[in-house]
Regions:
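Glycine/serine-rich anion-binding loops at beta->alpha junctions
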Residues: 105-120, 213, 361
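Acidic-glycine-rich active-site phosphate/pyrophosphate-binding loop
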Residues: 88-102, 180, 195-206
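Acidic/His- and Gly-rich active-site-bordering loop/insert found
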Residues: 1-111, 130-136, 365
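Metal-dependent amide/peptide-bond hydrolase catalytic core
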Residues: 202-396
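Short glycine/proline-enriched loop/turn "hinge" motifs that connect secondary-structure elements
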Residues: 91, 134, 194-199, 266-270, ...
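Residue-level signal for inorganic ion chemistry
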Residues: 11, 15, 48, 187, ...
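Acidic/histidine-rich catalytic neighborhood of metal-dependent amide-processing enzymes
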Residues: 114-115, 119-198, 202, 396
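Phosphate-handling active-site elements
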Residues: 76, 102, 124-142, 170, ...
Length: 396
C-alpha cells in the first residue's frame, strides 16, 4: 500500500459530511457523528507536525476551520503555490465511511470528491518536505478548505485574508499575484489541467393567478397553466438561444427546470406557482444580467413571471489565462499541450475572483462524485501525486 492510498483510506474513515446535509437522502441517521471537517483537520495537523511543516488554522465557523500547512523555501518567498482541495463531503450512509479496496479501486464517501485530491496533494507536500529538493524561492501551501459543497465559506474566508495568511500582500517584489501565485484547486478532473469552469445560478420564477372554485374555473386565473407556458419557453426557445453561445472550453450555457410547486388541492384554481431553475453560466455572464435577460425574454413572449436569484452566495464561472507563467509551467510539467474546461462549479472561481489565479486538477472522475458507490482508481491516485510532486520539484 502506497503512502497516498493509506492516507486516503484514513481520510475516508474520518467522516466530514457538510453539516448542511444532515443525512443522505432516504438514509437513516448514522450511528456516529459524521458532520463537520474537524476530524480531518486535526488528523492532517498531526501528520503535518510530524513532517516538520508550519501549521495554521483559519476559523470559518465554530468547530470548522480551514487548515493551512506551509513548506517555506530556503530563501525569501518570491512566489506561492497553493494546493487547495476541500475537506467536506456530501452525505452518505454509515457504511460508506469504511473504505473498501476492490479491483484496483478504493471505494468510500469522498474517495474522488475530493479526499483523493487531499491525499495526493498532502502526500506530495510531505514527500517534498522530506527530500533535498525543497524550492529555493517558492513557498508551497496546502489549504484544506471547508464548506465547498454548500456555500464555499472556506474559500471565501480564505481569499478575504489571503495576504495575511500566506500570499504576502498579494504582491511580491513589485509583481502582482498573476505572475507570482497559482492555486491548484483539487477536484476530480481525471488528471487534466482545467482552466475554466461554468458558474451555477439558481433562480426562482413565480406566476400569480386568481383562486376560484374548481367547478367554475372561468372565474379564476390558473397560475399553473401560465407557468406551464413559461416552462415550455425555457426548455425550448430559451434553451435553443443558449446553445447558440459557445465557449471554446466549456461549450454552451444551459438551463434546467428542476422543481415546480403550485396549487393547494384539485378543486381550487391555483393562485400561485413557482419553479426552481438551474442556469449554468459562462465566463463573462453575471447573475444580474441573466435575471434581466430571462425577464426580457418572457416579456417578449407576453409571459409574466417574477424572476429572483435564490443562490445563497455568488457562484460565478471561472476562466484563467493559460498563458500565465505558472500555468504554463504546470502544463509543461504535466505534458499537456492544451487546457480543459468542466461543467461543474468549485472553489477555483472564488479564489480567482479574489485575485488568485486558479486552475483545477486532481485524480478521479466527477461521474463517481456523490454516488452511492463512490470510488477512485488507485493507479490514477498515485499518478496524480507523482505529477504534483514533479511539478513542485521543478519550481525554483
Amino acid at each position: 500500500m502506497t503512502r497516498t492510498e493509506k492516507l486516503l483510506a484514513e481520510l475516508i474513515a474520518l467522516p466530514s459530511v457538510n453539516p448542511a446535509f444532515a443525512t443522505a437522502d432516504g438514509a437513516p441517521a448514522p450511528a456516529r457523528q459524521i458532520h463537520g471537517e474537524i476530524r480531518v483537520t486535526d488528523f492532517l495537523a498531526a501528520k503535518a507536525a510530524k513532517a516538520g511543516l508550519d501549521i495554521d488554522f483559519q476559523k470559518v465557523f465554530p468547530d470548522r476551520s480551514n487548515i493551512i500547512v506551509r513548506l517555506l523555501p530556503k530563501n525569501k518567498v518570491q512566489q506561492t503555490i497553493l494546493l487547495a482541495p476541500h475537506l467536506d463531503t456530501v452525505g452518505a450512509p454509515d457504511a460508506l465511511f469504511t473504505p473498501q479496496r476492490k479491483n484496483g479501486r478504493l471505494h468510500g464517501r469522498g474517495a474522488c470528491d475530493t479526499k483523493g485530491s487531499v491525499a495526493a496533494m498532502f502526500t506530495a507536500l510531505c514527500e517534498l518536505a522530506g527530500s533535498k529538493s525543497r524550492p529555493m524561492d517558492t513557498q508551497i501551501v496546502f489549504v484544506g478548505l471547508v464548506d465547498e459543497e454548500y456555500t464555499q465559506s472556506g474559500s471565501r474566508a480564505f481569499v478575504a485574508q489571503a495576504s495575511r495568511l500566506c500570499v504576502p500582500n498579494m504582491l511580491t517584489n513589485g509583481r502582482d499575484a498573476r505572475a507570482t501565485t497559482l492555486a491548484i484547486v483539487g477536484e476530480p478532473t481525471k488528471l487534466r489541467l482545467v482552466t475554466a469552469h461554468k458558474g451555477s445560478l439558481w433562480l426562482q420564477l413565480e406566476t400569480r393567478g386568481k383562486a376560484a372554485h374548481g367547478a367554475t374555473p372561468h372565474l379564476g386565473k390558473n397560475a399553473v397553466h401560465e407557468m406551464a407556458k413559461v416552462v415550455d419557453f425555457l426548455e425550448t426557445d430559451y434553451a435553443a438561444q443558449l446553445r447558440r453561445r459557445k465557449h471554446s472550453l466549456l461549450g454552451t450555457a444551459t438551463v434546467n427546470v428542476g422543481q415546480i410547486s403550485g396549487g393547494t388541492q384539485p378543486n381550487i384554481v391555483p393562485a400561485a406557482c413557482t419553479i426552481s431553475v438551474d442556469r449554468r453560466t459562462l465566463p463573462g455572464e453575471t447573475e444580474s444580467a441573466v435575471c434581466r435577460e430571462i425577464a426580457a425574454c418572457l416579456r417578449a413572449k407576453k409571459l409574466t413571471a417574477k424572476v429572483s436569484n435564490t443562490k445563497l452566495a455568488p457562484a460565478p464561472a471561472m476562466e484563467t489565462d493559460s498563458a500565465l507563467p505558472l500555468v504554463r509551467q504546470f502544463s509543461r510539467s504535466l505534458g499537456q499541450t492544451s487546457p480543459a474546461g468542466v461543467d461543474y462549479f468549485c472553489d477555483a472561481a472564488i479564489l480567482a475572483a479574489g485575485g488568485i489565479p486558479s486552475v483545477v486538477f486532481g485524480p478521479g472522475d466527477i461521474a463517481q462524485a456523490h454516488t452511492a458507490d463512490e470510488w477512485i482508481s488507485l493507479a490514477e491516485l498515485e499518478r496524480g501525486k507523482n505529477l504534483l510532486l514533479n511539478f513542485l520539484k521543478s519550481l525554483s
